[in-house]
């Protein structure tokens, strides 16, 4: 009986971290892209001892660190929002909102995941600047649920800003996994700025479309969300958010000198984003969910494109 209850609790904890869904994988994309392409660039340098195996090893560590920390962030979000979630149709069955997991159990689970994520970063970065890479995303994750409150809206702060930062930040960690021992923290930030900016706006775009599914319930409860800034012009807002994506991505790709990436990343993303904007229907909030899924597929595709780039560099 006790074993059965433990298994049920473990399943609920996995659900609490969204490990039963694809959403946490979004937090791994920027780190994986950055690690793979930094690894490819390092391999292309003269007298480089970087191997394909090392690149993939660092890539795996970056994935685990990001995935675990995302799980911790999901728990924190639900811990803060449990009373709100209990009154929203889409979220009322979440483990904390429904009472399947207690607040104490959730907090212990969150701390465990955050500690494991820190440990993985220690290994990946060889102990260098771990706090500098961990604290910014931790602080943003703590603030995220409060960005949905009415006070945040009055201050011009929307939760999508904070979420976008947390999803873009692993790009910095990914580059540090390859170049961290060879360049300063400030230089890593500078090199990652175009990619981070691109991912920042990409995340706001896809999350604005995704959260628009809850527009009816959110307006009843006064939940703050970025689509509020557009009013009835949500479609125009999404178009505006796509624009900086298509500006920053070429800036990042220009330094990599890869025709393959221009075709497989810039080309595919441009076509896909255009198709998404055509298919989005403001009168059908559920259409925001299809944009979310389409961008998940784009993220997976881009990982594969970056893997190919590593092998192209390794064989050159």
Swiss-Prot record:
Diterpenoid pyrones display various biological activities and higginsianin A shows anti-HIV activity. Its EC number is 2.5.1.-. Keywords: Membrane, Transferase, Transmembrane, Transmembrane helix. Gene3D superfamilies: UbiA prenyltransferase. Its cofactor is Mg(2+). It is found in: Membrane. Pfam families: UbiA. One of its GO terms (molecular function) is transferase activity, transferring alkyl or aryl (other than methyl) groups. GO terms for cellular component: plasma membrane. PROSITE patterns: UBIA. Belongs to the UbiA prenyltransferase family. This is Polyprenyl transferase dpchC. It comes from Colletotrichum higginsianum (strain IMI 349063) (Crucifer anthracnose fungus). The gene is dpchC.
């Amino acid at each position: 009986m006790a074993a059965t209850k433990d298994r049920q609790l473990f399943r609920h904890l996995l659900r609490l971290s969204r490990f039963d869904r694809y959403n946490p994988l979004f937090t791994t994309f920027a780190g994986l892209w950055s690690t793979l392409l930094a690894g490819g660039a390092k391999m292309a340098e003269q007298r480089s001892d970087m191997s394909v195996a090392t690149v993939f090893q660092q890539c795996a560590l970056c994935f685990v660190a990001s995935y675990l920390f995302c799980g911790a962030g999901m728990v924190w979000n639900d811990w803060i929002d449990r009373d709100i979630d209990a009154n929203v149709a889409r979220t009322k069955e979440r483990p904390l909102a429904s009472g399947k997991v207690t607040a104490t159990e959730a907090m212990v689970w969150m701390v465990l995941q955050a500690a494991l994520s820190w440990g993985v970063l220690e290994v990946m970065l060889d102990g260098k600047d771990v706090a500098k890479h961990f604290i910014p995303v931790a602080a943003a994750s703590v603030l995220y649920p409060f960005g949905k409150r009415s006070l945040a809206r009055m201050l011009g702060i929307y939760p999508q800003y904070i979420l976008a930062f947390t999803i873009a930040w692993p790009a910095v960690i990914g580059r540090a996994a390859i170049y961290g021992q060879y360049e300063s923290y400030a230089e890593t930030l500078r090199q990652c700025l175009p990619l981070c900016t691109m991912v920042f706006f990409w995340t706001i775009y896809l999350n604005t479309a995704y959260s628009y599914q809850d527009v009816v319930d959110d307006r009843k409860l006064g939940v703050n969300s970025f689509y509020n800034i557009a009013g009835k012009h949500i479609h125009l807002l999404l178009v505006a958010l796509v624009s900086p994506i298509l500006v920053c991505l070429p800036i990042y790709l220009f330094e990599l000198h890869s025709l393959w990436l221009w075709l497989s990343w810039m080309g595919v993303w441009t076509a896909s984003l255009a198709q998404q904007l055509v298919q989005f229907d403001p009168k059908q909030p559920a259409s925001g969910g299809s944009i979310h899924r389409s961008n998940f597929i784009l993220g997976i595709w881009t990982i594969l494109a970056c893997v190919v780039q590593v092998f192209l560099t390794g064989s050159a």
